[in-house]
């Protein structure tokens, strides 16, 4: 059984076949391995599509029909005769995530705790009871907040807990935990507390105490109520109610609470649960206020949209696009390290393509990937940011199982996560490929500045991206020459030595760039001969490498390798 959610329609595919046509929908939820995927508007070009036997292949079947332009609000899907070999394999994973939420009303929502989580909650309840009995303090109430609640409702694992306290600072409460455990003689939980000070200038408004309890990382922070006086920085931070705190958070699905004392999920914005159910990214307050409080939340909206394949609501998009002050604040107020952390999470997430799609189409490309000062730029022009989106989409297709059917070499499907990360990072930096700037009198590629300074990635990342971007023309030329006349052993060996151990990723990135002119035909790849011919060139080149046993020639000592090449040329 496969449940496909289309607005309020649940389509169940089972039995021998089902005939449904022209369904209008805004999103489809497909669940596999505890991850929800939302596939926005697409059109089946063919009259029918067979559902493959492997759930992972089903995901690819759906994803391949996503449009290569900006995702539209509503699309049309035509389902013809659908094979049913999936059977009960997939149904064992349902309901998950948002589909699971469809079966629960807000009042009935419960969270099932793991053994570790139960132990943590028991300790925290004991600490509050201890404080009530021994300290002259207001009643202490504890709630787990934010991402843990969201992930538990989506049935994901989460090992980081944020505990919100109504009447104490995080550090005060953490010290009381230590006091209580020492008094109880609990040798299994030796609490070490680290306090992260607030930094309002960088939008870090609250002091946070971090510790590890029962093997789980826990942050303690007080519920907040911020008071502003015509400034982006709060003039005072007061203890707030859970409702005050919920409305100060980034998005509604992160503003849910789990009350440790009652065991209930609390939705004070009245939208968190419904947005989680409907797959929407929305700010609790008007988005201009939420973003001015912390402009990094713009990127967090994008990250969570791409992580869960959710839709950012239109009023939030409009503010991001039209309010230039938000972009200025994101560029000037937020540390580049924080920006880089968000970008890294997007690249490592389930859909780096949707992430860069949103960055580009919300007009944030040169804000996030900001270039050096204009006076330092000496040559070249910024290519349209759409090119990085095009290459990212081509990479996604080349890396997918679907491309195996179109003579894309299998070596590209064996790349590890770090290699894929480098490929997408190179795609993100592509618009700066032909630009140079001067630093200390030395001319350098602008993309090096962007990676090293704008998003604060490592020098290793800079070197990897330099290799991928600088080798595009060389690889395309070498592969084309081999297609006309087979490259001899010496020439091919020197090529692999030049590309080093990264030669598979370098070839794949060059291939993705060579396919750019054919991009508009990518949804018709099966019928397009030119795309097949380009793929064939690279497959032929790789097969030549393996035929001559040169796939690891880069690791051989240079002198010995040169002699071998000379003897066999």
Model regions and ranges:
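Catalytic cores of the polymerase beta-like nucleotidyltransferase superfamily
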Residues: 2-569
């Amino acid at each position: 059984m496969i449940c496909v959610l289309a607005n309020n329609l649940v389509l169940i595919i089972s039995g021998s076949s089902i005939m449904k046509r022209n369904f209008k929908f805004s999103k489809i939820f497909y669940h596999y391995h505890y991850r929800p995927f939302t596939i926005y508007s697409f059109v089946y070009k063919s009259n029918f599509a067979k559902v493959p036997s492997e759930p992972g292949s089903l995901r690819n079947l759906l994803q391949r029909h996503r449009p290569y332009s900006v995702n539209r609000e509503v699309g049309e899907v035509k389902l013809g005769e659908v094979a049913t070999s999936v059977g009960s394999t997939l149904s064992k994973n349902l309901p998950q995530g948002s589909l699971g939420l469809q079966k629960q009303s807000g009042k009935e929502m419960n969270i099932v705790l793991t053994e570790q989580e139960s132990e943590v909650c028991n300790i925290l309840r004991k600490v509050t009871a201890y404080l009530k009995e021994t300290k002259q303090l207001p009643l202490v109430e504890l709630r787990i907040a934010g991402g843990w609640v969201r992930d538990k409702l989506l049935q994901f694992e989460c090992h980081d807990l944020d505990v919100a306290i109504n009447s104490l600072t995080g550090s005060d409460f953490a010290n009381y935990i230590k006091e209580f455990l020492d008094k109880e003689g609990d040798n299994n939980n030796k609490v070490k507390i680290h306090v992260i000070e607030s930094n309002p200038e960088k939008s870090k408004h609250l002091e946070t105490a971090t510790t590890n309890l029962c093997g789980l990382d826990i942050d303690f922070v007080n519920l907040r109520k911020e008071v502003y006086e015509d400034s982006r920085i709060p003039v005072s931070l007061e203890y707030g109610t859970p409702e005050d705190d919920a409305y100060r958070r980034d998005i509604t699905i992160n503003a849910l609470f789990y009350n440790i004392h009652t065991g209930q999920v609390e939705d004070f914005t009245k939208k968190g649960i419904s947005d989680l159910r409907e797959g929407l990214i929305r700010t609790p307050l008007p988005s201009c206020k939420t973003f001015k409080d912390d402009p990094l939340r713009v990127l967090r909206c994008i990250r969570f949209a791409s992580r869960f394949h959710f839709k950012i609501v239109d009023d939030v998009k409009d503010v991001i696009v039209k309010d230039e002050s938000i972009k200025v604040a994101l560029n000037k107020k937020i540390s580049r390290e924080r920006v880089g952390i968000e970008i890294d999470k997007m690249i490592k997430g389930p859909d780096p393509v949707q992430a860069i799609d949103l960055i580009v189409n919300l007009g944030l490309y040169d804000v996030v990937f900001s270039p050096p000062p204009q006076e330092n730029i000496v040559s070249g022009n910024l290519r349209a940011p759409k090119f990085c989106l095009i290459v990212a989409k081509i990479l996604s297709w080349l890396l997918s199982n679907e491309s195996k059917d179109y003579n894309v070499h299998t070596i590209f499907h064996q790349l590890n996560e770090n290699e894929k990360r480098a490929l997408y990072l190179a795609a993100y930096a592509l618009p700066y490929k032909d630009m140079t700037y001067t630093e200390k009198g030395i001319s350098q590629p602008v993309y090096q500045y962007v990676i090293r300074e704008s998003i604060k990635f490592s020098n290793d990342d800079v070197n990897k991206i330099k290799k991928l971007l600088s080798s595009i023309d060389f690889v395309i030329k070498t592969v084309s020459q081999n297609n006309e006349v087979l490259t001899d052993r010496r020439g091919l060996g020197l090529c692999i030595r030049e590309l080093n151990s990264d030669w598979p990723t370098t070839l794949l990135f060059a291939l993705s760039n060579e396919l750019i002119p054919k991009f508009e035909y990518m949804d018709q790849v099966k019928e397009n001969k030119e795309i097949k011919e380009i793929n064939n060139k690279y497959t032929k080149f790789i097969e030549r490498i393996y035929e001559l046993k040169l796939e690891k020639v880069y690791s051989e000592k240079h002198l010995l390798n040169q002699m071998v090449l000379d003897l066999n040329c």
